[in-house]
Every structure is written in structure tokens, then in C-alpha cells.
A protein has these predicted regions:
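Catalytic nucleophile-elbow at a beta strand-turn-alpha helix junction centered on a G-D-S/GDSL motif
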Residues: 24-39, 67-70, 99
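Short Gly/aromatic-enriched secondary-structure transition segments
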Residues: 41-45
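A short beta-strand-loop structural module common to alpha/beta enzyme folds
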Residues: 54-70
């Protein structure tokens, strides 16, 4: 009972969706996963199509992903690529490179305290501009189950930072880290390192893009 209570307090996975409306301008901010998500079968495109078929028809969906980006990069281009577009909703899917790039040289990644400070500041600036925010936890660097991937513990740490910020800043949450773990536990019977939801342990294949689109739509109340 105590374990369940602690989990409920520490993981705000039941955060209320940021319901998309026909008048919304939604910006997806992130790295190469989001850049690729703007392609023909990418998750950003799939979200746009789904919203266009439903009660949020008319909502504008903009991809703002750049390959290799980490939190400090988002800080530098926030005004140009996000705030200047006058969004009403901003979805931030970041953290993979903050962990991955620091695997061999910590100076090339983003330390946890810097990640928290930077991401929190980005959220505050977006909220000050009047937009709602959805934070997405970083998904995977390797698809093996049960914490067997080399950087799983680090990704879990950065995901927990993201969940905490979502709770503290009262944002929406798309907990991709948990969603991927749950899906791979069911779908990765051969315990493969890649090929279920990713092409290369990180970047999404067609199934992965469809999966992320579904999770994002849930966070958008669809």
C-alpha cells in the first residue's frame, strides 16, 4: 500500500490532458525525433491529421525539431522558433541527447541540474507568453526490457526530473518513458535492442511514430 501511495505521489502520469481546440496553434519542440516527426509518416504529421479529422479540426500543428538539440539549444532558439509563432500549446519532447551525448564525454551532455534549470526556465517563458505546455519524458536509447540498456538509469533520472517539473509547473505530461517501457514489455518478446519502435535504438520507425502520435493525442485530450 505504501509503495503504491509513493508511486502515485511521485509520478503525475494522470495529469489532466491539455485539451486541443480548433483555434489552437500547437508547436512541437524537440530534437531529431521531432524533426523526423514532421515527415510524411512522422508523429507530428499523424497528430495533425488526427486533429483535422476530429473536434479540433482547424488547429494548426507546427514541427520545431532540430537534430542534435539538447535543452541549452532549445533555450537559444525559443524566441525564434516558438514564441514568435504565437502558439497556444507547446509540446516539449527533449532529453535524449542531453543523456546520450554525455555518454563518453559528460561535457557534451547536459548535467541533471542544468537540465532541470533550463527546461524549467523554458516552461516559464512559454507560460508567461500565455501558452499551455505539455512536457514529454525522454523515450529510449535501446529497446531491451527491464533496464538492460546501458543508459536506462540515466534516462529514468531525467524522466523523473521532467515529471517533477510537470507537477511543479502545472503542465500537461506525456510520459513516453513509461509508455515505451510498457509497450516494449509486451511487444519485444525477443528482447531486441532495436526494430520494435525504433530504427536504431533512438529514432522512431513507422510503428514508433504511430505509437508516439497516439500518446501525444492522449495528452492533447484526444
Amino acid at each position: 500500500m505504501m509503495t503504491l501511495l509513493i508511486a502515485a505521489i511521485s509520478t503525475p502520469a494522470q495529469a489532466a490532458p491539455v485539451a486541443a481546440k480548433p483555434t489552437d496553434r500547437i508547436v512541437f519542440l524537440g530534437d531529431s525525433i521531432t524533426q523526423g516527426g514532421a515527415g510524411p509518416k512522422g508523429y507530428v504529421t499523424l497528430v495533425r491529421q488526427k486533429l483535422g479529422d476530429g473536434d479540433a479540426k482547424g488547429a494548426e500543428v507546427i514541427g520545431a525539431g532540430i537534430s542534435g538539440n539538447k535543452v541549452p539549444d532549445l533555450e537559444k532558439r525559443l524566441e525564434r522558433d516558438v514564441l514568435s509563432k504565437k502558439p497556444t500549446v507547446v509540446v516539449i519532447y527533449i532529453g535524449i541527447n542531453d543523456v546520450w551525448h554525455g555518454e563518453r564525454d559528460p561535457a557534451k551532455g547536459t548535467m541533471p541540474d542544468r537540465f532541470e534549470q533550463g527546461l524549467g526556465g523554458i516552461v516559464e517563458k512559454i507560460q508567461a507568453a500565455g501558452a499551455r505546455v505539455i512536457l514529454a519524458t525522454p523515450s529510449v536509447i535501446g529497446e531491451k526490457k527491464g533496464g538492460a540498456n546501458k543508459l536506462d538509469a540515466k534516462l529514468d533520472q531525467y524522466s523523473e526530473i521532467t515529471r517533477k517539473l510537470a507537477k511543479d509547473k502545472k503542465t500537461g505530461l506525456c510520459d513516453l518513458r513509461k509508455a515505451f517501457a510498457d509497450q516494449l514489455a509486451k511487444a519485444n518478446g525477443a528482447d531486441k535492442e532495436a526494430g520494435i519502435l525504433t530504427t536504431d535504438r533512438v529514432h522512431l520507425n513507422e510503428a514508433g511514430n504511430a505509437f508516439v502520435a497516439g500518446e501525444m493525442l492522449k495528452a492533447l485530450g484526444k
